Amino acid sequence: MCERSLYRAGYVGSLLNLQSPDSFYFSNLRANGSQLAALPPISYPRSALPWATTPASCTPAQPATASAFGGFSQPYLTGSGPIGLQSPGAKDGPEDQVKFYTPDAPTASEERSRTRPPFAPESSLVHSALKGTKYDYAGVGRTAPGSATLLQGAPCASSFKEDTKGPLNLNMAVQVAGVASCLRSSLPDGLPWGAAPGRARKKRKPYTKQQIAELENEFLVNEFINRQKRKELSNRLNLSDQQVKIWFQNRRMKKKRVVQREQALALY
């Protein structure tokens, strides 16, 4: 057990105004920085005093960084913040921590007073945006982002918006053709991801009477024609090879239906 004795350095040194070990390097300074005017400097080391020796078990363990500054911290500078010199693994404590101050470091109270903006992930923002427009059937004026572009880009958007501002009449007749034309013209403009319109189909050109007469005469001679005869007919009648082929196919089906109808009438 370590006993508190009046002969320890902490008690006797304060009564006799003894200096700290660092004061041997600065003979005119005390431990707190003030000058010692009355007493002359002591020339013998502190360990020679009989009451200055302390057992090893009573000596508190101090970190290596504390001895570099003589066991006390540097004076505080105005407008500065503390920076600790302890290693990350050292135990935190008010008596073991040694700090010095730099003018650029902000104080801890200022850092705590700063409010940081709350972080919201992108998925929650998208979810909150969709929540307001998913089941919103009551608000006619509010529309989804995709439908807003359709209403703005369509030529009949102004008249449609004016109709929706007033009270809705369920018995009102809607012009389907006009609405369909507006939607058809606005869908390719408002939906860039949609499928591109396919190749426009050629307008069907009806056969002239002269062409039909020539094809009928050839059909009476032979219902099935070969490729050479079909090519001659297409060149003579100013038709394509595909048109001549399709006409003969349709003519054979027409003849087959006529024969089936005659057979059905003969049974009854």
Curated annotation (Swiss-Prot):
A GO cellular-component term linked to this record: transcription regulator complex
Domain of life (superkingdom): Eukaryota
Keyword entries, A-Z: Developmental protein, DNA-binding, Homeobox, Nucleus, Transcription, Transcription regulation
Cross-referenced PROSITE patterns: HOMEOBOX_1, HOMEOBOX_2
Region of interest called Disordered, as start-end residue ranges on this chain: 102-124
UniProt-recorded Gene Ontology molecular function terms: DNA-binding transcription factor activity, RNA polymerase II-specific; sequence-specific double-stranded DNA binding
One biological process term in Gene Ontology: embryonic digit morphogenesis
DNA-binding region: 200-259
Subcellular location: Nucleus
Family membership: Belongs to the Abd-B homeobox family.
Function noted in UniProt: Sequence-specific transcription factor which is part of a developmental regulatory system that provides cells with specific positional identities on the anterior-posterior axis.
Name the UniProt record assigns to this protein: Homeobox protein Hox-D12
Annotated organism of origin: Mus musculus
Taxonomic lineage: Eukaryota, Metazoa, Chordata, Craniata, Vertebrata
